[in-house]
């Protein structure tokens, strides 16, 4: 009699467990919204330029991600390069820019970098301007 009561008691508690559905969570491919840079070019060659004549190039990009892209800072490698950039959030599919103006004080070959920090998948991007300054 004890065995029958024990079997009935165990089956009374385990039957509801088998009737519940399990929640399946996919941990392998989480979906996060992220902004992403799609640059038209990351290097620009000015060629030959004159001393003390500023030259400017505008690097353009598209936010190919699915969240707003925000540039937090843009820094040039030296004081001879002044930068400007899109300061408002760039929505998915929209375009933005980083502008670099270089003013050479002496003749010679140059190569300068502009570092872009943003909330994109590639959070730090290096842009390069180069050329040759002639008298």
Please state what every model-predicted region is.
Residues 52-58, 105-113:
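Short, solvent-exposed loop/turn segments enriched in Ser/Thr/Gly
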Residues 4-13:
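Sec-dependent N-terminal signal peptides
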Residues 24-60, 135:
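Beta-sheet-dominated interaction scaffolds and their linkers
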Residues 108-135:
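Terminal connector regions
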Residues 67-74, 126-128:
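Short, hydrophobic/aromatic beta-strand segments
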């Amino acid at each position: 009699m004890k065995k029958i009561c024990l079997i009935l008691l165990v089956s009374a508690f385990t039957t509801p467990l088998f009737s519940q559905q399990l929640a399946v969570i996919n941990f392998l491919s989480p979906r996060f919204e992220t902004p992403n840079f799609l640059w038209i070019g990351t290097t620009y060659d000015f060629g030959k330029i004159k001393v003390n004549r500023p030259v400017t190039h505008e690097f353009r990009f598209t936010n190919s991600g699915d969240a707003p892209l925000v540039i937090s800072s843009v820094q040039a490698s030296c004081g001879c390069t002044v930068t400007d950039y899109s300061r408002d959030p760039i929505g998915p599919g929209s375009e933005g820019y980083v502008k670099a103006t270089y003013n050479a004080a002496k003749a010679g070959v140059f190569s300068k970098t502009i570092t872009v920090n943003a909330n994109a998948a590639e959070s730090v991007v290096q842009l390069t301007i180069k050329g040759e300054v002639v008298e």
